[in-house]
Amino acid sequence: MTRRLFTSESVTEGHPDKIADQISDAVLDAILAQDPQARVACETAVTTGLVLVIGEITTSCYVDIPKVVRETIREIGYTRAKYGFDGDTCAVITSIDEQSPDIALGVNRALEAKTGEMTDDEIEAIGAGDQGMMFGYATNETPELMPMPISLAHRLARRLAEVRKSRLLPYLRPDGKTQVTVEYDGDKPVRVDTIVVSTQHHPDVSQEEIRKDIIEHVVKPVIPEHLLDENTRYFVNPTGRFVIGGPQGDAGLTGRKIIVDTYGGMARHGGGAFSGKDPTKVDRSAAYAARYVAKNIVAAGIADKIEIQLAYAIGVAKPVSIMVDTFGTGKIADEKIVELIKKHFDLRPAGIIRMLDLRRPIYKQTAAYGHFGRTDIDLPWERIDKAEILRMEAGL
């Protein structure tokens, strides 16, 4: 079999782009908690001493956005000005409009309902909030049915935050990045080739101490021992110093970590970000649905790995296309898989919202460490409750 290397990265909750994602989703959750029917498209920018929250929000409730912003920043760990950012003293500017009535026209009553193909009751009168294509992916190379490189990179990033917040490594600060290179023998992951960890730190700690502690307290508890060998390479803060970080080191924007949020580059991406968007936005809800479909198909044993593309037109409820690719691992024909998908999954926006119960404040917890393959939180699109019926109908 051919040997190949594949690399994926993750970032911690203190990374500037992830601060922005978490603020956008914290605002979304605060609104959905009071008004499940709200329309939210919330974008955030963070830089030294400043948070800017912009977007289109249509809701019947009131949310104190600056308060939500400050609470989120404090939870992440930016609580002192010497960290380069402080949730209590940073400026918060908001500029919020209502959703465009032209967009609302297409979303409120889907085109099929207007043309009489279906009743409002059947589709709950929600068309797609935008055109676009979304991808879902699953593979049986890990128990959570995710690609191993992104799965391990997320675990390292989450562990970095754990040892910082528990003060096991009290000199760590919130910003950080991880990267994992996995060696494959054909399609099977066999070892970890390279690990990169960059973490913000107190100025008075030595590079040698950081390297020793990160390998001992972050890498070893997280990466399975059988994947590491004497040839595995470790790069810990390879520039030698990472004191200035967070929004002081780099500006951050919502939606700038879409590959970290999904499959680490192993699958294709339609380009739409998730955070700050209510579930009528198919960028988010249809990507979740595509993952749900893909995971259930792999869990059913119909394929070892699968990529699914869904595509939508604004104001139209039914997907304009559904594509599957099993990379030669399918036990039945791809066309038959598409038939099963159409039969067992309602992929109209209203159907997705109902199927996955998406009008709830569940989004902030997804805004760091990945939206898929999460084993630390219960997400509806990660359930495999349709695997058995799919297996039976596939004749396996």
UniProtKB/Swiss-Prot annotation:
- Cofactor, free-text remark: Binds 2 divalent ions per subunit.
Record keywords: ATP-binding, Cytoplasm, Magnesium, Metal-binding, Nucleotide-binding, One-carbon metabolism, Potassium, Transferase
Q: Catalytic activity annotated for this protein?
A: L-methionine + ATP + H2O = S-adenosyl-L-methionine + phosphate + diphosphate
Q: So which domain of life are we looking at?
A: Bacteria
Compartments annotated for it: namely:
Cytoplasm
Q: Where is this region: Flexible loop?
A: 99-109
Main subcellular location of this protein, as a coarse class = cytoplasm
Q: What does this protein do?
A: Catalyzes the formation of S-adenosylmethionine (AdoMet) from methionine and ATP. The overall synthetic reaction is composed of two sequential steps, AdoMet formation and the subsequent tripolyphosphate hydrolysis which occurs prior to release of AdoMet from the enzyme.
Q: What is this protein called?
A: S-adenosylmethionine synthase
Which organism's genome codes for this protein? Carboxydothermus hydrogenoformans (strain ATCC BAA-161 / DSM 6008 / Z-2901)
- What's the encoding gene here? metK
